[in-house]
Amino acid sequence: MIQSQHSQTARHALAETVVLAKARKNLSFAQLTEGTGLSEAFVTAALLGQHALPADAARVVADKLGLDDDAVLLLQMIPLRGSIDDRVPTDPTIYRFYEMLQVYGTTLKALVHEKFGDGIISAINFRLDVKKVDDPEGGSRAVITLDGKYLPTKPF
C-alpha cells in the first residue's frame, strides 16, 4: 500500500545516513543509480528526501549502501517535499541558483508565458540533467537542463 509521510524528520535522518554510507563506501550517485532504471537526478533527489523510489529501486540502492528494511520502506514513502528553509539559502551552490532566479526569474516567466501562454512548468512531470563540459576558454562549464511539462491555466 502506498504510504505518505507527514513530516520531514525521518527522511532528513535517512538522507544523513545515506550520505554517510555513500561516503564510507566511496560511491557516487551515478553508481547508486545503476540498476534502478531511473535517472541519476531522480535517484539523487529521492536519496536526499524529495521523491519516493519504486520498491525494486529502493532495494537496489539500499543493498549498495547496506541499509536495513526500514530504510527501504522509507525510501518508498511519498515524502513531504521541500528542503530549503523560508530564508535566503546560505550554501554557496544553492545560493547561486537562488541568485540565478533573482536575476532571470522574471525573464524566464515572461518568455514562458510569451511562448506558451498563461500556465506553469511542472516540477512533477519533470526531468533534470547535469553535465560537465569543457569550456573553450579554459576550465569547465555546467550544463543544467530543466525539462518540465507545460501545464496551461484552465479557466473555471
Swiss-Prot record:
Active-site feature positions: 96, 99, 122
EC number per UniProt: 4.2.1.104
Keywords attached to this entry: Lyase
SUPFAM superfamilies listed in its UniProt record: Cyanase C-terminal domain, lambda repressor-like DNA-binding domains
The organism's place on the tree of life at top rank: Bacteria
GO biological process: cyanate metabolic process
GO terms of molecular function: cyanate hydratase activity; DNA binding
InterPro entries in the cross-refs: Cyanase (IPR008076), Cyanate_lyase_C (IPR003712), Cyanate_lyase_C_sf (IPR036581), CYNS_N (IPR048564), Lambda_DNA-bd_dom_sf (IPR010982)
Pfam families recorded: Cyanate_lyase, CYNS_N
Keyword Ribonucleoprotein annotated: no
Top enzyme class: lyase
Stretches assigned to coiled coil: none
Chemical reaction(s) catalysed: cyanate + hydrogencarbonate + 3 H(+) = NH4(+) + 2 CO2
Primary role: Catalyzes the reaction of cyanate with bicarbonate to produce ammonia and carbon dioxide.
Protein name: Cyanate hydratase
